[in-house]
Amino acid sequence: MSQTANQKAKRIPLGKDASTKRRLSKVRRHFRLRKKVSGTPERPRLVVNRSARHIHVQLVDDLAGHTLAAASTTEADVRAADGDKKALSAKVGQLIAERAKAAGVEAVVFDHGGHGYHGRIAALADAAREGGLKF
């Protein structure tokens, strides 16, 4: 059974649709960033993971492979806060700054995980800076 010209035109090869390209582009950006960014005990990596609904942040010492502190919008005190996703991201930035200070961390290397530096990512970074972290 052969396909008509119209059916052939509509076929998209596997892995070539828009969502796959977008995801792979993000992965490539993150790999490029990770080649340059590494966390140490004195200056750990501030890793940001963003999904459509939540944002997660970790302080990672790459040499030892340990997470020093973490914060997320899934925590009860952040969920109780009012505001949009950008405001909740700023709250997470304040939380990670407090927890970093408690862990004895003053300066961090920012790893935005292949995401663009705007919106929720920028709000989180600005709040962490206001909380006393040096990027």
Curated annotation (Swiss-Prot):
One of its GO terms (biological process) is translation. Keywords: Ribonucleoprotein, Ribosomal protein, RNA-binding, rRNA-binding. InterPro entries: Ribosomal_uL18_bac-type, Ribosomal_uL18_bac/euk. One of its GO terms (molecular function) is structural constituent of ribosome. The keyword RNA-binding applies. This is one of the proteins that bind and probably mediate the attachment of the 5S RNA into the large ribosomal subunit, where it forms part of the central protuberance. Part of the 50S ribosomal subunit; part of the 5S rRNA/L5/L18/L25 subcomplex. Contacts the 5S and 23S rRNAs. HAMAP family: Ribosomal_uL18_B (MF_01337_B). This is Large ribosomal subunit protein uL18. It comes from Rhodococcus jostii (strain RHA1). The lineage of its organism: Bacteria, Bacillati, Actinomycetota, Actinomycetes, Mycobacteriales.
